[in-house]
Amino acid sequence: MKYAFYPGCVSRGACPELYTATLEVCNILGIELDEDSLRSASCTGAGVLQEKNLRLGDTLNARTFAMAEKAGLPLMTICSTCQGVMSQANQRLVSDPEYLASINEDLKEEGLEYKGTINPKHLLWIIVEDLGMDFFHSKVVRKLEGLKLAPFYGCYIVRPTEALGFDENPERETSLEAVIEAVGAEVVDFPGKTLCCGFPILTINPKNSVKMVANHTIDAKDRGADAMVTPCPLCHLNLDGYQPNASSAAKRDIDLPIIHLPQLVGLSLGIDPEKMRLNKHIVSTKKLLSELAVAP
C-alpha cells in the first residue's frame, strides 16, 4: 500500500519522535510513504486559521488534496488535528461544486485542480481498516501483556462524526482500543478520552490548560493506567510537555508516560525504543520500558 504522506507540522518540529517512529512502523507493515508529492504542502490551518479566514484554510487544504490527486495516491496523516481539519475542509469542498470551482480558480496559478477524490486518512484508521486487524495481529512479535493503557483520542479525530465518516466506518469510534488490545495490552477506559487535552487554550488560558492536563492524566492514573496512548501530536505536546506543570498545580507527582500511537505499535513490532526516540519524552518512559523488559 502506498500513500501520499502528510506528516503535519508538529511531527517535523516539536515531536520529531512521532515522525521517526512512523517511518519505522510503516516499513515493517509494508506501508509505502511518498513524501515527495506533498513536500511543499502547507499547514492545514489547525482550526485556528479557519476561525479567521475559512476560505483561505480550505484553499490550502484543497491545494494539498490536489497534490495527492496529481500523484494518484490516497493521503495519509499522523496528526489527529490535521485529520479533523482536512476532513471538515474536504466535506465543504465536495458538497458544494460551486465553492470547489471557485477554490480551483485560485489553484490554477500553480497548475493544480482538486477533483474531490481524496479521503484523508489517519494512520490509526489505515491500520484498522486498510491493513486490517488480522494482518496487524500477524505482524505483532512482542505482546505487551500486563501493560495497562488509557486511550486518548482528543477532539479532532472523533468529531464532527459526519465529516469523519463514522456512519460508514463505525469501527473508528473504538479503533484506538482495538490497537491496544491487539498488542496484548489492557484498555483502561476513562470519561475524558474524547475530550480536549487543553492545547488549543494553552496560550490564552494556560492555567485552565494545565488543569485539563491534570484532570485527564490523574483520572487515567487513578484508574490503573501505566501510560496513555494518543494519535494526536498536539495532545502529546500538552499531556507530556505540561505534565510537570500539572503535577505542581495538583500537588502530586502524576508520572504518567504519554506514548504516540506509532511508538506503541512499534514496541509490539519489536522495534528498538531508541529508534523511536522513546527516551526523548518529558515524562520518562524508562520505568515503563523496564517493566516490559525492553531496553530504554
Question: Can you describe what each PLM-predicted range is?
Answer:
Residues M1-P296:
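Iron-sulfur cluster-binding electron-transfer modules in prokaryotic oxidoreductases
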